[in-house]
Amino acid sequence: MDKFKEIRPIVLGIVKRDDKILVSKGYDKIKNETFYRSIGGGIEFLENSKEALKREFKEELNIDINVGDFLGISENIFTYNGRNAHELILFYNVEISDSNYKEKYHIIDDNCETDAMWINIDKFINKELKIYPE
């Protein structure tokens, strides 16, 4: 089945440092829109959400994390690059050690390249920058 025609379970980690959160930068070429999203990804069959989050951080940022408290779940129905998608998202607090701290991380995921960076949370609250899911 086409992955854009099913409900996809994903997990995202909320990483805070001072007044900033760690997010990856994305771009929707159909909407001509730059957006940001917390780090994470799909939960594989028979994989629990905490293990999926650890795996995603290792794959995307090459760092080990400590998964903290469960923050909640959200349903996200959206269009990305002209295709409909539907996600159920589990959110966790995440901690990274000082030895893994960088101002910017380069991500290569599914043959796409982007960066993850620390952005002041006020930029999202004040709607200066777009974060998904809202």
Predicted features and spans:
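Short, flexible active-site-adjacent loop segments at beta-strand->alpha-helix junctions, enriched
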Residues: 19, 27-28, 74-76, 96-98
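Unchanged
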Residues: 43-66, 76-129
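Charged phosphate-binding loop/patch that engages nucleotide di/tri-phosphates or the phosphate backbone
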Residues: 130-134
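Conserved Nudix-box catalytic region and its N-terminal flanking loop in Nudix hydrolases
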Residues: 20-59
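A generic fold-level signal
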Residues: 6-8, 16, 31, 84-87, ...
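Short secondary-structure boundary/capping segments
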Residues: 3-5, 13, 28, 82, ...
